[in-house]
UniProtKB/Swiss-Prot annotation:
Record's protein name: Allergen C-C
Localization of this protein: Secreted
Disulfide bond residue pairs: none
Cellular component terms (Gene Ontology): extracellular region
Keyword Acetylation appears in the UniProt entry: no
UniProtKB keywords: Allergen, Secreted
Family per record: Belongs to the protease inhibitor I6 (cereal trypsin/alpha-amylase inhibitor) family.
Keyword set includes Chloroplast: no
Taxonomic classification: Eukaryota, Viridiplantae, Streptophyta, Embryophyta, Tracheophyta
Superkingdom assignment: Eukaryota
Length: 27
């Protein structure tokens, strides 16, 4: 999920960016 993949201090990965995009779309 967004919170699981995009947490402070963790490297920004392609999967993270995808999760962020999906999270934004659902809001």
């Amino acid at each position: 999920s967004f919170r699981e993949q995009c947490v402070p201090g963790r490297e920004i990965t392609y999967e993270c960016l995808n999760a962020c995009a999906e999270y934004a779309v659902r809001q």
